[in-house]
């Protein structure tokens, strides 16, 4: 901790800027508010899979690089999350077996967070690829 944050406790939040990429002014206001609240760390990427991989095998990390750079400039540390909290639409359409199965034997519908089958080999492989 001494080398990373000068011995200070982490004071932060989950941050999901991928929701506002078309509105850079929202990020700038968020950054201003984070600084005003003395935020020194954020978790990024928890629900960003559909933006990081909009199509199977097609990746876009440019926005994430840009956000990380701006946070770094503002002396805000970044904790990268595994972006499996929300699956992209293409994944559930192509591989419906990644969806959780309820007690009545029916699969959950897509659109919820943390809604994947933890034992699905396909899901595990797709998370590793990402």
What is the role of each PLM region?
Residues 22, 58-63, 118, 122, ...:
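Alpha-helix N-cap and loop-to-helix initiation/capping positions
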Residues 85-130:
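Active-site-adjacent "subsite" loops/lids of carbohydrate-active enzymes
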Residues 4-8, 41-45, 105-111:
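Short amphipathic alpha-helical segments, especially helix-boundary/capping motifs
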Residues 27-104:
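Aromatic-lined substrate-binding rim segments of carbohydrate-active enzymes
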Residues 16-18, 53-55, 117-118:
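Short, contiguous strand/loop micro-motifs
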Residues 1-23:
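Boundary/entry segment of secreted carbohydrate-active catalytic domains
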Residues 20-36, 127-130:
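Short, acidic/polar
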